[in-house]
Amino acid sequence: MSWQAYVDDHLMCDIEGHEDHRLTAAAIVGHDGSVWAQSATFPQFKPEEMNGIMTDFNEPGHLAPTGLHLGGTKYMVIQGEAGAVIRGKKGSGGITIKKTGQALVFGIYEEPVTPGQCNMVVERLGDYLLEQGL
């Protein structure tokens, strides 16, 4: 399966039990900042934004004072899982980022999708990739 298929079929799909509820944008990005696959709606990000995200995975709490920035959008960092998941909130939407051995799985959402639904979609794919050694 191509990386684009993972984004299209496992991240940008209808959320279980909620037809027409899907993430706003999603991507799989290598730890080096190279995009493996992304939805057409995923924001163009700056290298320093990706560096900040990677630093927060290695040094949990790094982004808390400044917020998480992606594509020029600032998210307030909320509870995550140190070294494994970063979650951010902005208005009625937010972001979930799951770290795997080689990649970061991104999901961005707006209402009516809930934070829990975004977490489920992103973390399920991230956990699967971890199980596959990726």
Curated annotation (Swiss-Prot):
Phosphothreonine modifications at: T114
Keywords carried by this UniProt record: Actin-binding, Allergen, Cytoplasm, Cytoskeleton, Disulfide bond, Phosphoprotein
InterPro entries in alphabetical order: PFN, PFN_euk, PFN_sf, Profilin_CS
Annotated localization: Cytoplasm, Cytoskeleton
Posttranslational modification: Phosphorylated by MAP kinases.
Motif (Involved in PIP2 interaction): 84-100
Repressor in keyword set: no
Gene3D superfamilies: Dynein light chain 2a, cytoplasmic
GO molecular function: actin monomer binding
Keyword Cytoplasm belongs to the record: yes
Matches recorded under PANTHER family: PROFILIN (PTHR11604), PROFILIN-5 (PTHR11604:SF25)
Protein function: Binds to actin and affects the structure of the cytoskeleton. At high concentrations, profilin prevents the polymerization of actin, whereas it enhances it at low concentrations.
Subunit record text: Occurs in many kinds of cells as a complex with monomeric actin in a 1:1 ratio.
Assigned protein family: Belongs to the profilin family.
Further remarks about this protein from its record: The variability of the residues taking part of IgE-binding epitopes might be responsible of the difference in cross-reactivity among olive pollen cultivars, and between distantly related pollen species, leading to a variable range of allergy reactions among atopic patients.
Name under which the protein is recorded: Profilin-4
Protein species of origin: Olea europaea (Common olive)
